[in-house]
Amino acid sequence: MMFTSESDLMRTIDWNEESNSVVLVDQTLLPQEYKVIECKTLSSLCEAIKSLRIRGAPALGAAGGFGIALAASLSGAKDLESMTRDLKVAAKALKSTRSTAVNLGWGVDRVLNAISDAFDVQGARDIALQEARDIAEEDIATNKLIGKYGTKFLKDGDSVLTHCNAGRLACVDWGTALGVVRSAIEEGKEIKVIACETRPLNQGSRITTWELMQDKIPVTLIADSMAGWAMHQGLVDSVLVGADRITQDVVFNKIGTYTHSILAKEHEIPFYVAAPISTFDFKGWEGSVKIEMRDPDELRFSGCQQLAPKDVEVYNPAFDATPMENVTAIITDKGVFYPPFLLDEVLV
């Protein structure tokens, strides 16, 4: 299915007023099928997060916010104290779905904190939904700012290598890393994207290439293992990725990002990270963050096809950690930060 304009694509995640439910693009079906699914219960939303129907740090922040709004809508509590208990249970369930992405918990906590201003149960429901909607709206504005600050790093005619998907489908709309590309193109620059497949779930080949092709942005798909050779051949002008969590010492992002950072450093190619301030974990460091481990069968199988012996031992972390010394700059909605990266400066 090819869409003819941006208006054909709904936001990655939104609220359906008529059914009081969360609606989202099921990214597990791409590129074969573009389908919007409805989450009418908290358990269905949690399943959507766990199974990566919705993924990407900023999108998960919105999912966390809408999740609390959904729980408030479904709660049968008669008083604020009972509702608060219900929402704390919902918050725990939402946060447990993905351990590494900081935005999910940030979105949950932001809506919970907003509800503290409520005077009654209906007021809490109204505040929760409005705060969740604010998170979604702010995400789009934030991504546009990231794009604005990042375009100076992309020259007319550049080829940009990216990993996983940090585009509109990783956010409510527009994108972080790919948002920088979109902003540069809006300025009239010709930019090409080299998308790494991003094994084992192939977010690069399934989602990034599909998304860019919808917007008619030139994209070339390569195997993950070819990135270094592409750099050696002079095909890559810069590497531009998103982030799932940024701590004092490292950038957590999709597995394979660390390898790209080493290859970029070896070939003297700039390595940029594009992420909102909400992705920063100001108190964390590499050793304090639990990296999510995925199902071993993601490596043993591709769909229904077996790729490896069923009983082979598998090590399948979802993320890796790129040290700050490998990062040229971090592009945020508050501006660009350069090494040495002092997170206290980000708070100013």
Curated annotation (Swiss-Prot):
The record marks C164 as: Transition state stabilizer. GO terms for molecular function: S-methyl-5-thioribose-1-phosphate isomerase activity. GO terms for biological process: L-methionine salvage from methylthioadenosine. Transmembrane segments: none annotated. Its EC number is 5.3.1.23. Pfam families: IF-2B. Substrate binds at R55, G56, A57, R98, Q203, N253, K254. Keywords: Amino-acid biosynthesis, Isomerase, Methionine biosynthesis. It comes from the Archaea. The active site is at D244 (proton donor). InterPro entries: IF-2B-related (IPR000649), IF-M1Pi (IPR005251), IF_2B-like_C (IPR042529), Initiation_fac_2B_a/b/d (IPR011559), M1Pi_N (IPR027363), NagB/RpiA_transferase-like (IPR037171). It catalyses: 5-(methylsulfanyl)-alpha-D-ribose 1-phosphate = 5-(methylsulfanyl)-D-ribulose 1-phosphate. PANTHER family: METHYLTHIORIBOSE-1-PHOSPHATE ISOMERASE. Catalyzes the interconversion of methylthioribose-1-phosphate (MTR-1-P) into methylthioribulose-1-phosphate (MTRu-1-P). HAMAP family: Salvage_MtnA. Belongs to the eIF-2B alpha/beta/delta subunits family. MtnA subfamily. This is Putative methylthioribose-1-phosphate isomerase.
